[in-house]
Structures are given as C-alpha cells and as structure tokens.
Regions:
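Long, charge-rich boundary regions
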Residues: 2-4, 30, 106-115
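Short aromatic-glycine motifs in intrinsically disordered, low-complexity regions
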Residues: 17-21, 92-100
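Structured, basic alpha/beta domains of bacterial-type, RNA-associated proteins
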Residues: 66-70
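Short cysteine-rich clusters marking metal-coordination/redox-active sites
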Residues: 73-76, 90-93
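Cys/His-rich microdomains that often coordinate metals
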Residues: 79-80, 97
Length: 115
C-alpha cells in the first residue's frame, strides 16, 4: 500500500512544480523507480487516477521507468549491476562490500505542461 502514499507525494510535487510554472494542465509525467525501493510500477499506474483526481494532473499520461541497482565495490572501485541483493559479489575482486549508486530512489523525472 506504500505505492498509494508515494503516488500522492509525486502528484503533489508535480502539482507544485506546474503551479510555479503557471501551467493550466499537466499532460504527462515520468517517474523513475529504483529496483530496491519495493515500489511496484503497476500499482503506481493503478493509483494514479485516484491520486490525481481534481488536480492539474487529472487525465495526464504516467510513464514509469525502472532503474537497475548499480554499486561501486569498496575494495577495488569497480562499478557493476549485481545479480542479487543482498549477496552481491564484485565481478572483479570477489568482495561483497559496496556503495549503492543507483536503484534505491523514486524520482519525478519530468512533467509536461500546457500553459
């Protein structure tokens, strides 16, 4: 159910941005969803009509794109997309300690507006 609260926050952020730009309507928005977030894009699509009802985003086209997990090995600096998390192993040195670079955020990437 956290997809609904996430969608409400994204709609609110897009609404604020559109209002600052003097928009009359938001026609499309793009959301990036990291694989580690636990957010299912199918539920974002499901909840978008309800979350956007009565806002500038009502009737807009939603696009969700996945962001794969990307890490940097803390031992050798190699950047890679692990096969699994946890349990990732650097393909270069075999160590498991890594810094996550991408894949753990939900981001409002773009909105298209009508002025």
């Amino acid at each position: 159910m956290h997809e609904l609260s996430t969608m409400i926050r994204l709609v609110s952020l897009a609404q604020e941005t559109a209002e600052k730009e003097g928009a009359k309507k938001v026609t499309a928005l793009t959301v990036k969803v990291g694989e580690m977030t636990g957010i299912l894009p199918s539920y974002l699509y499901k909840y978008f009509p309800e979350a956007s009802r009565g806002t500038l985003l009502e009737g807009a086209e939603l696009t969700c794109t996945g962001v794969p997990v990307r890490v940097r090995c803390l031992s050798c600096g190699t950047e890679y997309e692990p096969d699994r998390i946890p349990g990732r192993v650097c393909p270069n040195c075999g160590k498991t300690a890594a810094h996550i670079l991408a894949g753990r955020d939900v981001t409002l990437e773009n909105i298209e507006i009508e002025s």
